[in-house]
Amino acid sequence: MEYIKTATEVYILKIIGGPASQLLASRTARALGTEPVLCEFNRFPDGELYLRIAEEIENEKVTLIQSTPTDSDFVALLQLIDACEGAAEINVVIPYMGYARQDKKFKSGEPVSARAIARCINADRVFTINIHEKSVLEHFPCPAENLDAAALIGSYVAGFGLERPMLVAPDEGARGLVKNVASGHGFDHDHLQKTRLSGDTVVIKTKNLDVTGRHVVLVDDMIATGGTMAESIRMLKSQGAIDVHLACVHPVLTRNAALRLFHAGVKDIIGTDTLEKAESKLSVAPLIAEALSGY
């Protein structure tokens, strides 16, 4: 894909994938009609990361794609940005941004970790995907844009062929995402509400709609430990749901989360490739490619 700056300057968009986002970078490059730039990644004997961009990128327009689920992945992103010194423009895509949930101080003496991370990104433009707290975008020292994968998830769910599926948010915070996923497909949607009956008895149920005899799709931006989702799955099935599917943007799925969810009775887990897991059945590459095409 070519970006024409002037009559004499033509830049070929260079897509560079970090170690955490190799597949996504390749898919994005293909969506843009190009090939990803080759990189070398290795470890020194003491465990430090070595990387090298194996193609010439000086005076080129480059886009780095790297999720940062671990500290090591964040360091790799910083190294990639530094290795691109001399490029005409550096765009950074952080599909999943670690520390984004630490967007404020909860106790005295704590850092605002999301702010600390964002301030380190020295680029011309940053893209995130369904970042947990949009306020984090204000901390980047450059223009930052949050992309929404809701429409991709909606189309994927529509492909299930379920009769009258109901989309459900596990809490108030996910209502906006669920509404956007349902938009354009006419899906019924609702959210779960906790009602405390006594000191130790809490009932979780949909606020407005009855799940009896319905195919339910629980939707959230991320699934981490799976504890809350597992509880929700059991409650929905006990209330008459035919089956329960899970769909999320970021399949973090720490430790035995997937096992916990299947033990609770989930039929399927669908995530995107913002994180490359076995559950990453849907690619956000078209979303990234479309965003990059606008610049």
Curated annotation (Swiss-Prot):
Localisation per UniProt entry: Cytoplasm
Binding site for D-ribose 5-phosphate: 196, 220
Active site, UniProt feature: 194
Cofactor requirements of the protein: Mg(2+)
Keywords associated with the record: ATP-binding, Cytoplasm, Kinase, Magnesium, Metal-binding, Nucleotide biosynthesis, Nucleotide-binding, Transferase
Residue numbers binding Mg(2+) 1: 132
Pfam families in UniProt: Pribosyltran (PF00156), Pribosyltran_N (PF13793)
A GO term, aspect molecular function: ATP binding
Keyword NAD among record annotations: no
Gene Ontology CC annotations of this record: cytoplasm; ribose phosphate diphosphokinase complex
Residue sites binding ATP per the record: 46-48, 101-102
Cofactor annotation comment: Binds 2 Mg(2+) ions per subunit.
InterPro entries registered for this protein in UniProt: Pribosyltran_N, PRibTrfase_dom, PRTase-like, Rib-P_diPkinase, Rib-P_diPkinase_arc
Binding, Mg(2+) 2: 171
UniProt record, GO biological process: 5-phosphoribose 1-diphosphate biosynthetic process; purine nucleotide biosynthetic process
EC number: 2.7.6.1
Signal peptide feature range: none
Keyword presence, Kinase: yes
Pathway assignment: Metabolic intermediate biosynthesis; 5-phospho-alpha-D-ribose 1-diphosphate biosynthesis; 5-phospho-alpha-D-ribose 1-diphosphate from D-ribose 5-phosphate (route I): step 1/1
Function: Involved in the biosynthesis of the central metabolite phospho-alpha-D-ribosyl-1-pyrophosphate (PRPP) via the transfer of pyrophosphoryl group from ATP to 1-hydroxyl of ribose-5-phosphate (Rib-5-P).
Family: Belongs to the ribose-phosphate pyrophosphokinase family. Class III (archaeal) subfamily.
HAMAP family linked to this entry: RibP_PPkinase_A
This protein's name: Ribose-phosphate pyrophosphokinase
Species this chain originates from: Methanosarcina mazei (strain ATCC BAA-159 / DSM 3647 / Goe1 / Go1 / JCM 11833 / OCM 88) (Methanosarcina frisia)
